[in-house]
Amino acid sequence: MIFYFSGTGNSQWAAKTLALQTQDELYSIAKIIKTDCTFQLKKGEQVGFVFPVHGWRVPRIVRVFLQKLKLTDEEVQPLKHHCFCLMTAGDTIAQAMERFQQHLHETPIGRMLELDLVGSVIMPESYVGLPGMDVDTKEKELEKKQAAEIYLRDFGKKIIQKQKEDDYKPCGWKELTVGPLPWFFSVPVGGFFERFLITDKPFHVDSQRCVKCGICANVCPVADIKGGLGYEPEWLHNKKCLTCFACYHHCPHHAIEYGKRTVKKGQYFYNRYKVKENI
């Protein structure tokens, strides 16, 4: 089974692509986190996690899900199940994978899973919350998607073959796109992101452009937007916002802004013609 979280569709596409190769069942973390999150593993069944990097860290919703997830085994004396993790990012992931490994080990399911395959795939940029950060050009977007397709074909083969390395690190660790200064970006910068930049407070709507279609409320993965068809969006400020920018990117009239930081910036989500799937 593969558990995934996605805001603008990159990780959803990656998870679906892998599931087609591996024949694994897909579960949206944003949907199942509202349940008791209990699943039974079959003999030899593997578990995968696919999600984007947020501020060079694991998204809060994924961390909460790991704590809530309960896995049972049909075997009386079960062996550890194979586990893989794939992260999507616009550029680098820094120490996000190390942090995921730590989060996993700190949960009850960590005793049942053996993280033996990891990967990071570069996808079109969607973070627009800081000056100088914008979506990619159409040419760059296409280039990244084509490279990602090739990467996922190879990663899917490794999942099926249950590849391992003799080293103490999971297979694929050395190829992760950690970038320069990984500790700096994941620890002090990532901490700054979580404390000050992951918030819904700057979001606002331009009433002259808003057509009250309700798309923004529908695509919010944490139900942080009050509204719907016939209503302007109202952010709840309940500290659940992930700042994934799904609401901003999916607005068909570019009526949503994030303070002044998104003025004249572009929009992006993976599949522009199937809005309802990108949650």
Residue positions per predicted region:
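Short acidic active-site motifs
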Residues: T35-C37
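FMN-binding flavodoxin-like domain, especially the glycine-rich phosphate-binding loop
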Residues: I2, S6-W13, L20-I33, K42-F51, ...
